[in-house]
Amino acid sequence: MGKIFDYDGVPVLHTTSGDLKGYFYDGVYIYKGIPYAYADRFQMPVPSKWNGVKDATNYGFVCPLQNQDTPNGELMVPHRYWPQDEHCQSLNIWTNKLDPEAKKPVLVWFHGGGYAAGSSIEQVAYDGVSIAKKGDSSLVSVNHRLNILGYLDLSPFGEKYKNSANAGHADMVAALQWVHDNIALFGGDPENVTIFGQSGGGMKVIDLMQIPSADGLFQKGLVMSGVMEGDPLGAGEKDGTEIVTAMMKELGFDDVAQLETVPYPQLAAAYAKVSPAIAQNGGYIGGGPKKGDYFCGNPFDAGFREHAHQIPMMIGTVYGEFATFAPAAYDKNKLTAEEILEILKKVYGDNAEKVLDAFKEAYPEKNGVDVLAIDRAMREPTVKLAKLFAKGGGKAYLYNFALEFPFQNGKPAWHCSDIPYFFGNSDLVEICGIPDVSDKLESEIFGALLSFAKNGTPDHEGLPHWPETEAEDADTMVFDKKTEVKHNYDDKVFAEINKVLKPWSFMDMMTDNIQH
């Protein structure tokens, strides 16, 4: 028999916000666009309430973007685009059982896009059916306020704006509170919640570990490609006086309250006009959460909170991240050893041979020219953060997704290319169609996620033993055609590269093909 659909037979659920009705398809109960909170612009969210039965068969609005959606790179990272509105606080749930006693592991997904873009349904691979059906878990994905709606500091202009710079994060905490209060209705265990996210979503996972009001709302965290040192997104340490004053001047306003009601496109246009000059002069332009009473700050600067060390963490990167979006300038499979060395000398000069030797020691199966695509954005900071976490007593499990794809003469893994495997959705992404590789790799990665969500450790029968990171020592599970644990394996590569190249800059690797 084919896939079964049911709507009329699906019971109405009585949540803390109101009555809710979803639908059933192919073994999974699906609820879309559940309003978990409401907020006026720049204000803290309040719990949602509605009368009657809320139809949960349509995704909710996604947060407005500052720039127009531009389809590109769809083969590498297939996207979905959706109507936008700033009242975007909604979540989606996939589960295979509506039994309050089922106590299934709960996974809550925070999307990528930095703090400025993205949505809970942005990527095709975000679909939650596999986690619910094959993974026997409940999957929740969350929309929240972004960019200037979620992260613009107006606190110098009045007490009512006290936490406007963290409004987007406050939305996420409100979503977690809604999940805690209601997920048992969907078969989930409110005391076994794993939050996970990629890119900006990974950053959000770390941030939530640094927010006291989120304590107790999740028990584990998975950080995917979400660690960078410094201030790459421009949050800054100063307050919003300069940027907000400049926006008001651009709009011809004399009262900050006018920013609360001006149409979003005009607000975004004013920000886009005045922010570059302020950023160039080192001023605050928003862009991320702001350290203070609500958010305790980046752990590189502020250290991890004591409570954070109680939360086991999976944390990792992909081989190339941003460096591999643009096509290579050559067919590496046709290069001789001499040609490879000459190419590397153009980048690493007299240190090229040492770089190549260290790289071949770390990745003996890869083409030597692939060292040019190695991730210098996130891998080193990720290892550093995992060690910092371990030093404080936390349990961290490092990974690196190093698969080469059959595209453009063998493209190393790029930012987002691991997502289909974590969601058990490699069959939804065409470029993952790699015979004898993708099924095995998905089993390894998907199995690690599910084991971590259930037990707090990613170990499972399909993998070699996965050791915890230590304060001065790092074992990494390298997911590839042959998955294996490697010990401090790429330290020498980066040491040799860093003798020649300046520290990585976020803007150095930005291309028109970057996805999130």
Regions flagged by a language model, labelled:
Residues 181, 215, 224-339, 368-391:
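Substrate-access "cap/lid" subdomains that shape
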Residues 162-184, 239-242:
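Alpha/beta-hydrolase active-site loop
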